[in-house]
Amino acid sequence: MLRNIIRFKGFGKGTSGGFLKPVSFRVQLTRCYRYDNGPSYRRFNNGEYSQKSSFKSILLDKSSRKYLALLFGGCSLFYYTHLDKAPVSDRSRFIWVSRPLELTIGNYTYKSIWRQTQQEILPPQHPLSIKIENIFMKIVEAAYKDPSVDNSLLDGIKWEIHVVNDPTASPNAFVLPGGKVFIFSSILPICANDDGIATVLAHEFAHQLARHTAENLSKAPIYSLLGLVLYTVTGAHAINNILLDGFLRMPASRQMETEADYIGLMIMSRACFQPQESIKVWERMANFEKQMNRGGVVNMEFLSTHPASTRRIENMSKWLPKANEIYEQSDCSSMGNYYKSFFSM
């Protein structure tokens, strides 16, 4: 999503499925299922015995180390046999969560968010809902044309657009596993135009196309295991959380956000939306953040789940030549006039 003030957490930026998510939404998808704050331990017999000391004794026992070696070998084999390539970016990532489970979680999350927003959602026949649906479906159609995309991930999905008409909410947009799309009217001034809306929607769509929800779920047991190992060294799970967040969870989240920026830019270009508008969107986002943070603390990127807007602008500028190439190869010059005339009706 986005930044803290805004899921693009999809585009929001948190400090965990975007812009910033409304404070009341605690579920973060693209970016990020987090079920606990780390492993916890219970001491017995007035501290004479602990899981920490027990785990250390296992490490020191020769026969136990053999079993640990076998366990490590099995886990390594499982890891390497579940490596997958992300579409468009071609990044290798570890995913073991099944597609049905991913869709089930998306459906559960949708019901929860629907209950919170249903009073503000515009009807499907509203002009703004129709406009955003048309933009989004052009992005989906463009994804089908990308040779690196597994079309089976898109087949059979019933895409539903929900425009949340709440100007006071934090600017936000996100796409859930299973095809449920939410975009808040408060983000539209930052989008400014159709190409800006496409920038936001393509980013959020990219999170689901790349299965970032499943990737986050797949990493959760690894983080728990590492937390257990760290506990044998630090003896304090608060320190474990700081280490895991600073060196693993947050960098991984920023990596997925950056990947969604890249995939989204390439797909929106293939859909004949102006790729250079993505830079302007993030410039407006950066200005919005400055206004919201006036007199506040400095937002440090390494403490955030999302890249800084300035870094996203740098990335977009670096990727723009390739995006322009895709735009030209998609015969967008002739399609552009038709598209503009269609939406001016």
Curated annotation (Swiss-Prot):
The annotated modulation of its activity is: Protease activity is induced in response to various mitochondrial stress, such as changes in membrane potential, oxidative stress or chronic hyperpolarization, and depends on its C-terminal region.
Q: Which InterPro entries match?
A: Mito/Outer_Membr_Metalloprot, Peptidase_M48
Describe the disruption phenotype: Reduced ability to form viable colonies on glucose medium after acute treatment with hydrogen peroxide or chronic exposure to carbonyl cyanide m-chlorophenylhydrazone (CCCP). Cells are resistant to rapamycin and display reduced TOR signaling. Oxidative-stress response is impaired.
Which CDD domains does the protein's record reference? M48C_Oma1_like (cd07331)
Its predominant location is mitochondrion
Q: Which residues lie on this side of the membrane: Mitochondrial intermembrane?
A: 89-345
Keyword Magnesium recorded:
no
Q: What is the effect of changing residue 212 to Y?
A: Loss of protease activity
This molecule's function is given as:
Protease that is part of the quality control system in the inner membrane of mitochondria. Activated in response to various mitochondrial stress, leading to the proteolytic cleavage of target proteins, such as OXA1 and COX1. Cleaves and thereby promotes the turnover of mistranslated or misfolded membrane proteins. Cleaves the misfolded multi-pass membrane protein OXA1. Involved in quality control of cytochrome oxidase assembly: mediates the cleavage of COX1 in cells lacking COA2. Required for the stability of the respiratory supercomplexes. Required for TOR signaling.
Q: Could you tell me what this protein is called?
A: Mitochondrial metalloendopeptidase OMA1
- List the source organism: Saccharomyces cerevisiae (strain ATCC 204508 / S288c) (Baker's yeast)
